[in-house]
Swiss-Prot record:
Active site residues of this protein: H20
Catalytic activity: an N-acyl-L-alpha-aminoacyl-tRNA + H2O = an N-acyl-L-amino acid + a tRNA + H(+)
PANTHER family in alphabetical order: PEPTIDYL-TRNA HYDROLASE (PTHR17224:SF1)
Protein name: Peptidyl-tRNA hydrolase
Species name: Paraburkholderia xenovorans (strain LB400)
């Protein structure tokens, strides 16, 4: 059963629409669905709400520590409410998946994502669930003939808003993720994965 859903992103209006904030977009939608508002909760270093979703009580969290210190926020809440790593779902942007794709997985490495890296370090565990929201990689924007030796600027890419057509398919992927939240929250994660991964 999932008791805590974390959205990763950077605080501040200048980052709201950037690719790196895709995790925030999902949690914002969940808060709207639950008819609740995320509020600044200093003891958890983030915006927090306790929500009733699909008949269950769920904690929603958006760390306000900047991405590379997200673990500080997650562990503060998890320890306070005695939530185990495998009861946590972290929604985050995923460079290695194209815009419009979304996948669930348990555990694994950070894939170079600093937010995941810090959460793993603070929880002393990789065994938490991830909802990977595809944002694409800047190398995909380089013509194939020019890719050899090219060094795309990943940091700049994730801190820019998606193009309009990318935003549309990212929004659609978040809608697909929201559609499986009843199973996710109830702990039927294998079923949720089958349903989500059936729709690329």
């Amino acid at each position: 059963m999932i008791k805590l859903i974390v959205g990763l992103g950077n605080p501040g209006a200048e980052y709201t629409a950037t690719r790196h904030n895709a995790g925030f977009w999902l949690v914002d939608q969940l808060a709207r669905e639950a008819g609740t508002t995320l509020r600044d909760e200093r003891r958890f270093h983030g915006f927090y709400a306790k929500a009733r979703l699909h008949g269950e009580e769920v904690h929603l969290l958006e760390p306000q520590t900047y991405m590379n210190r997200s673990g500080q926020s997650v562990v503060a809440l998890a320890q306070f409410f005695k939530i185990l790593p495998d009861e946590i779902l972290v929604a985050h942007d995923e460079l290695d998946m194209p815009p419009g794709s979304v996948k669930l997985k348990l555990g694994g490495g950070s894939g170079g994502h600093n937010g995941l890296k810090d959460i793993t370090a603070h929880l002393s565990s990789q065994q938490y669930w991830r909802l990977r929201i595809g944002i694409g990689h800047p190398r995909d924007l380089i013509p194939e003939s020019a890719r050899a030796g090219a060094r795309p600027d990943v940091a700049n890419y994730v801190l820019k808003p998606p193009r309009r057509e990318e935003q549309d398919v990212i929004d659609a992927s978040i809608e697909r993720a929201l559609a499986v939240m009843p199973q996710v929250i109830k702990g039927e994660l294998e079923r949720a994965m089958m349903q989500l991964h059936r729709n690329p």
